Amino acid sequence: MLDLIQTRRDLHQIPEIGLEEFKTQAYLLDVIEKLTTGKDFVQIRTWRTGILVYLQGSQPERTIGWRTDIDGLPIVEQTGLLFASQHQGRMHACGHDFHMTIALGCLERALEEQPKNNLLFLFQPAEENEAGGMLMYEDGAFGDWLPDQFYGLHVRPDLKVGQIATNTHTLFAGTCEVKIRFKGKGGHAAFPHEANDALVVASYFVTQVQSVVSRNVNPIEGAVVTFGVFQAGTTNNVITDTAFLHGTIRALTQDMSLLVQKRVKTVAEGVAAAFDMEVEVELKQGGYLPVENNPALARELMDFFDEKDGIELIDIEPAMTGEDFGYLLSKVDGVMFWLGIDSPYALHHPQMSPKEEVLAIGVAAVSSFLKKKAAE
């Protein structure tokens, strides 16, 4: 029987960023091959650093998919754990080590007998940086294994162990990366009339763009426009010719995301034109679409967990965090939910350390749900 805690600790020590998860893939394949030995109803495929494990059903009417992400983050770990990251500047600070371990535990249970329906376990790379789900889908990695229904979870530090939270609508926002570069004319600080100050223009933009959310977005729907990077200038007495901004747009529907993206671009171009300056605007959403749960499937999942002993189900509001599972759910009906891990530190924090007792709870809950779906 799989040692869940040891498996998690092994994976926690080898975090790798998206599409570089070579050690992670090798570890997972070793475990998967041991679990599936002698199971002639199982097939395994790889796609770059990803893995697909397909359980052929005995009387299949559909394929049920379970997705887990496998990549880490470019963060220096500060947990002080004896099994902390062995990869300098890399950390499983988003709980993907937990996601993988739970998926392996569920796979082990699913292999106890051949399911009626097909089951697909997806170990997806590059959730954090390259929208690996979209890359796999667009590259045809699923082939005839593409699920009819897709499910997945994400750990959540501010929920207690034993709590599962989701809803029948949108769980995560869609996110769009924004890069803006204003190009003016540099000069001496004493002669501003001979220059065109990119720093001043970018500052105008930062204040003006706040009106997008306050005046273009329905306040009932909401959206976020945040610029976390502002780079301009090299010294105090030189007017800079360029200013660079790097930010994010977040919205709970794709229509709203597209509206905000359009308005941000328009404001940037308008401010630049007003100051007779050039501007470059790069908008990159890729596969980070809103995670929209299928209402009927979500209701079914919520009712199932609501009746499980040891599980407290929470009907939760959407979060403005992003997840590339939204892309797969735009292609396949499915559901995502939060799993409580009770950590005082948020996701992506260098000290984030979930409670390990959630591993057994997660495996028991998810595997029982997948068993039900596979038997329908």
From Swiss-Prot:
Gene3D superfamilies: 3.30.70.360, Zn peptidases. CDD domains: M20_Acy1_YkuR-like (cd05670). Signal peptide: none annotated. Pathway: Amino-acid biosynthesis; L-lysine biosynthesis via DAP pathway; LL-2,6-diaminopimelate from (S)-tetrahydrodipicolinate (acetylase route): step 3/3. Keywords: Amino-acid biosynthesis, Diaminopimelate biosynthesis, Hydrolase, Lysine biosynthesis. The active site is at D69, E128 (proton acceptor). InterPro entries: AcetylDAP_deacetylase, Amidohydrolase, Bact_exopeptidase_dim_dom, Peptidase_M20, Peptidase_M20_dimer. It comes from the Bacteria. Belongs to the peptidase M20A family. N-acetyldiaminopimelate deacetylase subfamily. Catalyzes the conversion of N-acetyl-diaminopimelate to diaminopimelate and acetate. This is N-acetyldiaminopimelate deacetylase. It comes from Streptococcus pneumoniae serotype 19F (strain G54).
